[in-house]
Amino acid sequence: MKERKVGLALGGGSARGLAHIGVLKVLEKEGIPINMITGTSVGAVIGALYAQGKDASVIEDLALHLTQKRLFSLMDLTLPRTGFIRGEKIKGLLEMVIGGNAKFSDLRIPFACVATDIMTGEEIVINQGLVLDGVRASISLPGILTLATWGNRHLVDGGLVDPVPVDVLKEMGADFIIAVNVIPDIRARIHITDKDKTGKIKEPNIIGIIMQSIYIATYSLARTSLEGADIAIQPQVAHIGPTNFWEARECIELGEVAAKASIPEIKRKLEA
């Protein structure tokens, strides 16, 4: 296998993003080197953990402990000035697994996460300072989780501008890019998950409306990003609800299935 600078872009997608763990398990097993990582939203969380040197099985164990009861306990609701959920409990959980003092410069694998400046619409690439702060900004779903502050900027989820951060990897020097997208075709998602027993499309609640709006806006962006990757892995997770983190095991398995199917092409292209 030729020496290449292999970059891995892990996209956003809420609970569906747990499929990234399955992809990492397969890449590890097959000996595919990862020289740099970028992540958006849930991809930023998993990417940060992997960049710290935690192997996929350790990250998998963390994900499998996300029970429905545990998740509900993290919902510190607040008056919705910038979001329904204050996010301090979520940040506390992230601090437990990432560490409150871990810096980007401490990471074993170069890593960057992306967020969106809600005032200017700019993509903000975060690759310095505290990893915890960068990840917290990247996961801040607008209207749901309160804004994150980064210097004098107010940041929200990076998926609004770069749901699968392929171009950031190119800027970091990657010359072979594996991108993982878990944002499904919106028509497939509605067909599979949003109908009642009579076949009628359900009316979404306020959180569902916000998330649906984000998915509509980001699906086309994700497809465009994938065009810049050498390999695009797309786990079939449309039937997994975006907040169903307790379905981690199935998400991870679906990530493995998708990654295994891509291994022959990855090896062929790396050896070319």
Residue ranges: model-predicted function:
Residues M1-T40, A48-A272:
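Patatin-like phospholipase
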